[in-house]
Amino acid sequence: MSPTSFEPLALRAHRLFESRDLDETRERISRVMQPHALLPSGRMQGAAHMDFVRLGGLGIGTIAFGDAMRVQVDAVDGYYLLMFCLSGHAQVAAMGRRLGVDGQTGVLCAPGERFDAVLSADCEQFVLRIDAATVGSLTGNPRATLDPVLHISDAALAAWHQQLMLVARSPALLARANANPRVAAQLEHLLIDLLIEGHPPAAASMRHDPAPGFLLRAQEFVNAHYAQPLQLADIVVAANVPERTLRDAFLQFRGMSPMQYLRATRLEHARELLRRSQPERRIADVALDCGFTHLGRFAIAYREKFGESPSETVGVRR
């Protein structure tokens, strides 16, 4: 297939790494995506690279390996993975489907699902790492079921595609988003809103959350007691099921473990408090009030989730 006309010129200025070493390539990608397996068809000879930026909780990037490569993710962890090809092609197994992916057809893999892709040697991927909690808040369903097949040229997706190209091609826009977390958050929500508008969740998933009752009980318990020093055993007792059953259900229906859900809940509450807090209130106090006892880890987790530091959130509000 010939390369798509989608050329993300602005992203090229955000080169995360270049490497001919397989282990380094895997480790550098894992830092911004998640741990995964890379299986080259032979000895890796080409140069791999990744361009990557964050817009709030949305990650946008390109990945090329320079060689034919198989990428395996056991379970997409807490986000939706959207991928199509800028050049080359891929065969992807995801969401119970086998798909041919290129510049016109993309794949959207839900949290908790396995992702297995075989990429041609000339393949350069365009990837979006879309925070599952944000999709849940915008759709009203924390486990929204989105069709895994994405027809990039569909008229319904034209507004999303045009906005995505604008962001990826505009150095000035990316620079402004990097400098102003509020702009980044607005772009994040606009891109996700346009995607959902043009590629809506299945009607059944919008009407009914298929998660079992014990998982909903666990969520209600976490939402009511997130500020307390909860352990996994506390959530298991509230759900009244074995730990393995609860863990498997969270991974299947929420795309994350129970403790990851607890951390995400604490982070969401912390962000809301930081946005509404009085100027004299310390960030450390907000973190402690939301159940975080290690302030350094809180700051790292906050930036990973929202693409900005707690102090930057406070600065935008002021």
From Swiss-Prot:
Domain named HTH araC/xylS-type: residues: 216-316
Chain residues forming the annotated DNA-binding region: 233-254, 283-306
Keyword field contains Transcription regulation: yes
GO MF terms, alphabetically ordered: DNA-binding transcription factor activity; sequence-specific DNA binding
GO BP term, example: catabolic process
InterPro entries: AndR, AraC-bd_2, AraC_XylS_family_regulators, Homeodomain-like_sf, HTH_AraC, HTH_AraC-typ_CS
Recorded phenotype for the gene knockout or disruption: Cells lacking this gene are unable to grow on anthranilate.
Alphabetically ordered keywords of this record: Activator, Aromatic hydrocarbons catabolism, DNA-binding, Transcription, Transcription regulation
Role, per record: Involved in anthranilate degradation through activation of expression of the anthranilate 1,2-dioxygenase subunits.
PANTHER family hit by this protein: HTH-TYPE DNA-BINDING TRANSCRIPTIONAL ACTIVATOR EUTR, HTH-TYPE TRANSCRIPTIONAL ACTIVATOR RHAS-RELATED
Record's protein name: Anthranilate 1,2-dioxygenase regulatory protein
Organism from which the protein derives: Burkholderia cepacia (Pseudomonas cepacia)
Taxonomic placement: Bacteria, Pseudomonadati, Pseudomonadota, Betaproteobacteria, Burkholderiales
